[in-house]
């Protein structure tokens, strides 16, 4: 076994909800820890999947996802040949790390952020360099620039950032990109950007065409509600797009995932309603935390990161009362997914009771 792998701590996914519910002896358990879409999936997706031609199940899927490629390109206003599809964004993180990292190369992140960036850097024998966020949990771009050396081959920017939910402006990101050496890749993860107010003005989707070292990633798991289908994509400059297609596993995205993603794109009203409901409930959470005197980060995503005395005890209290939220991301802090209006009301009442 490679030494770089033997010492790793694995990414630990959540237990199946039914398993955890049975262990706790609960009649109901609501998961607000994985940033899933609480409003489900577009009915058009269900129809499309049910109508899929099952006689094709013994055939390989369209390896290039041509129909979906054209739909995404039209939706985003980009060159269809710049798109590389992946099994969720997890596979894309693997592909990027495998492509651009060699042993002892360094990967730079603004911390805290998504743990898989560092995990896959270490799998490739690389080293993770973390620059702490500013006091308001925004990216310290000046600190990142100071940390860039010839050994740094990749810089990850998650926007909105997971777990903080903070959003960086397109102007700030492009100004940073312009200072980064062209041989250092800047990887922008926009998994949650659909939830961001004014997302069209925030997205870096057009930057890869201008800067060969920029990659922008998107997923269908969040606002589109397709987490179970495992489908995402990245947009590359033409300098790298064809090469990335050779790195990608053949037939990586199955036909049902492609069908589901196409149907999801064809129902923009579902996404619009999801985003609107999330914004309404997110604002209620911020008002609740203000009223309770709780410190939290300004979020442009479908989750909120907050600081709480006895955070571990609060999370334990909540899960034993039917609500699972995320722990372990920063000492004394918790992350909760913005749920439905009813779930949010119930959860807020439980927090009041715990505080009392």
UniProtKB/Swiss-Prot annotation:
GO molecular function: histidinol-phosphate transaminase activity; pyridoxal phosphate binding
Domain of life: Bacteria
Pathway: Amino-acid biosynthesis; L-histidine biosynthesis; L-histidine from 5-phospho-alpha-D-ribose 1-diphosphate: step 7/9
Enzyme class: transferase
Cofactors: pyridoxal 5'-phosphate
InterPro entries, sorted: Aminotransferase_I/II_large, HisP_aminotrans, HistidinolP_aminotransfase, PyrdxlP-dep_Trfase, PyrdxlP-dep_Trfase_major, PyrdxlP-dep_Trfase_small
Keyword list, A-Z: Amino-acid biosynthesis, Aminotransferase, Histidine biosynthesis, Pyridoxal phosphate, Transferase
Protein EC: 2.6.1.9
Keyword Amino-acid biosynthesis: yes
Reaction catalyzed: L-histidinol phosphate + 2-oxoglutarate = 3-(imidazol-4-yl)-2-oxopropyl phosphate + L-glutamate
Positions where N6-(pyridoxal phosphate)lysine occurs in the chain: 222
UniProt GO BP: L-histidine biosynthetic process
Family the UniProt entry places it in: Belongs to the class-II pyridoxal-phosphate-dependent aminotransferase family. Histidinol-phosphate aminotransferase subfamily.
HAMAP family: HisC_aminotrans_2 (MF_01023)
Subunit relationships: Homodimer.
Name of this protein: Histidinol-phosphate aminotransferase
Species name: Lactiplantibacillus plantarum (strain ATCC BAA-793 / NCIMB 8826 / WCFS1)
């Amino acid at each position: 076994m490679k030494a770089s792998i033997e010492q790793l701590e694995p990414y630990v996914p959540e237990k199946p909800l039914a398993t955890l519910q049975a262990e706790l002896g609960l009649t109901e358990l609501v998961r607000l820890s994985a940033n899933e879409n609480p409003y489900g999936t577009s009915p058009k997706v269900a129809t499309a999947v049910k109508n899929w031609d099952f006689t094709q199940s013994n055939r390989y899927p369209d390896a290039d996802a041509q129909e979906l490629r054209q739909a995404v390109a039209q939706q985003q206003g980009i060159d269809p040949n710049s798109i590389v599809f992946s099994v969720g964004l997890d596979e894309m993180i693997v592909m990027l790390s495998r492509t651009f990292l060699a042993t002892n190369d360094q990967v730079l992140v603004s911390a805290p952020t998504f743990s898989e960036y560092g995990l896959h850097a270490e799998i490739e024998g690389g080293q993770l360099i973390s620059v702490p966020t500013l006091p308001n949990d925004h990216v310290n771009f000046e600190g990142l620039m100071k940390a860039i050396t010839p050994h740094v081959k990749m810089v990850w920017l998650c926007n909105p950032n997971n777990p903080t939910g903070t959003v960086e402006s397109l102007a700030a990101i492009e100004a940073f990109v312009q200072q980064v050496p062209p041989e250092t890749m800047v990887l922008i993860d926009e998994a949650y950007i659909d939830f961001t107010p004014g997302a069209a003005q925030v997205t870096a989707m057009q930057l890869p065409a201008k800067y060969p070292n920029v990659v922008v990633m998107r997923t269908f798991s969040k606002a589109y509600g397709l987490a179970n289908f495992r489908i995402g994509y990245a947009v590359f400059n033409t300098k790298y797009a064809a090469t990335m297609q050779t790195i990608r596993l053949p037939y990586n995205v199955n036909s049902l995932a492609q069908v589901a993603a196409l149907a999801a794109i064809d129902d923009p009203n579902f996404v619009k309603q999801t985003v609107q409901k999330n914004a309404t409930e997110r604002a209620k959470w911020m008002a609740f935390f203000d009223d309770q005197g709780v410190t939290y980060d300004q979020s442009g995503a479908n989750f909120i990161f907050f600081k709480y005395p006895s955070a571990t005890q609060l999370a334990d209290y909540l899960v034993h009362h039917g609500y699972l939220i995320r722990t372990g991301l920063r000492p004394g802090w918790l992350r909760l997914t913005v749920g439905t209006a009813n779930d949010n009301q119930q959860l807020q009442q439980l927090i009041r009771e715990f505080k009392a």
